[in-house]
Amino acid sequence: MYLEQLKEVNPLTICITNNVVKNFTANGLLALGASPAMSECIEDLEDLLKVADALLINIGTLTKESWQLYQEAIKIANKNQVPVVLDPVAAGASRFRLEVSLDLLKNYSISLLTGNGSEIAALIGEKQASKGADGGKVADLESIAVKANQVFDVPVVVTGETDAIAVRGEVRLLQNGSPLMPLVTGTGCLLGAVLAAFIGSSDRSDDLACLTEAMTVYNVAGEIAEKVAKGKGVGSFQVAFLDALSQMKSEMIMDK
């Protein structure tokens, strides 16, 4: 249901994301049926966010200047009631990243927080191994998602071998996906943009259902791509993944 709605709405998804993943993110959104815009100019965003459906803030290539950009962009999005997705990339890897992430969460209206276990654990004060965007293995993603949902009072998606979605104290665990996905730079960052497109094209009446479908669509596309690229390597997997996103239909995830 939500996937078909996304394709019909063609949500304008503003992505202020990191320099490593911009091309992949834009192509992934286009494949799925969304309309990406990668603007980083406040004067431009003043107009774009009047008609946008969602805003992604991904702090991957963080600078002091980009911190100010995030703040101003979120202010404009909040003023125009545009949902904001925050991906606090490598939040546990440095004090500066943690400071920026907490500032955005505590001082602005965020609609969705998404990250891996190490990133979200750092935000709630739990020590976990972190090595940048890849993070470390975290034992209890469910409890981390629930606690972050309670602490920040926003829906939370925590990714890992099992993905956890927490909304208003309710949690859902998902186990789809491919082990090849973490081997392609940008799959986690593209996910944040995909989640933004899904919630931006929904009526927000049931975020848990919407996010569950978004995660399942994304992860099943990874499973399909793995089969197509079997024996070929991660380069072929990346292409197959974009192909799979472009061909996804709701009936393909009915039994997942």
UniProtKB/Swiss-Prot annotation:
Pathway it works in: Cofactor biosynthesis; thiamine diphosphate biosynthesis; 4-methyl-5-(2-phosphoethyl)-thiazole from 5-(2-hydroxyethyl)-4-methylthiazole: step 1/1
GO biological process: thiamine biosynthetic process; thiamine diphosphate biosynthetic process
Keyword entries, A-Z: ATP-binding, Kinase, Magnesium, Metal-binding, Nucleotide-binding, Thiamine biosynthesis, Transferase
Cofactor(s) demanded: Mg(2+)
Binding positions (ATP): T114, T159
CDD domains: THZ_kinase (cd01170)
GO molecular function, one term: magnesium ion binding
InterPro entries in alphabetical order: Hyethyz_kinase (IPR000417), Ribokinase-like (IPR029056)
E.C. numbers: 2.7.1.50
Pfam families xref list: HK (PF02110)
Binding residues for substrate: M38, G186
Catalytic activity: 5-(2-hydroxyethyl)-4-methylthiazole + ATP = 4-methyl-5-(2-phosphooxyethyl)-thiazole + ADP + H(+)
Gene3D superfamilies: 3.40.1190.20
HAMAP family membership: Thz_kinase
Function summary: Catalyzes the phosphorylation of the hydroxyl group of 4-methyl-5-beta-hydroxyethylthiazole (THZ).
Family note: Belongs to the Thz kinase family.
NCBIfam families linked to this entry: PRK09355.1, thiM
Name used for this protein in its record: Hydroxyethylthiazole kinase
Taxonomic path: Bacteria, Bacillati, Bacillota, Bacilli, Lactobacillales
Gene designation per UniProt: thiM
